[in-house]
Amino acid sequence: MGIGPSRKVGDRGGAALKASFALSRRAARGALDPNQRIRGGGDLFERFRERFAAAQKEIFFAVYLDGRNRVVREERVSEGTLNAAIVHPREVLGPALRMCAASLVVVHNHPSGDPAPSAEDFAVTRRLAEAGRSLGFRSSIT
């Protein structure tokens, strides 16, 4: 016994419902296809925009890529305070070595809305680049 009259969903209605669920899953995970190919900063911006927009704290992610720049995995490395997140090279590079990533990209937000890199941002980037070079990762900092 049902709650109301039974209605069948036709092919078009079923396809629309399936598409709606797919969009909901994509929005809920806040990311594009996990195997997305990263071609540049725009792809990263789209991948993290929704998650960073609502964040009240600084969040630092590492995105691990294969040889064709497809996402193998992404990891939240650190969640900090309003204006800082502690990041150590071993927390970023260790997983890259374990999963045999060809390369990686790191991203973080500025909850203040000011996109200008801080002195600490430059220092962390420099430490990560130096540690990465010693392990065979090429730096592509621009």
Language-model segment annotations:
Residues 126-142:
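Divalent-metal-activated hydrolytic enzyme cores
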Residues 24, 28-48:
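Long, charged amphipathic helices and adjacent flexible linkers at domain junctions
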Residues 79-120:
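Short HxH-centered metal-ligating active-site micro-motif
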Residues 1-3:
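Long, highly charged, low-complexity intrinsically disordered interaction regions
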Residues 60-64, 141-142:
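Short beta-strand scaffold segments in enzyme catalytic cores
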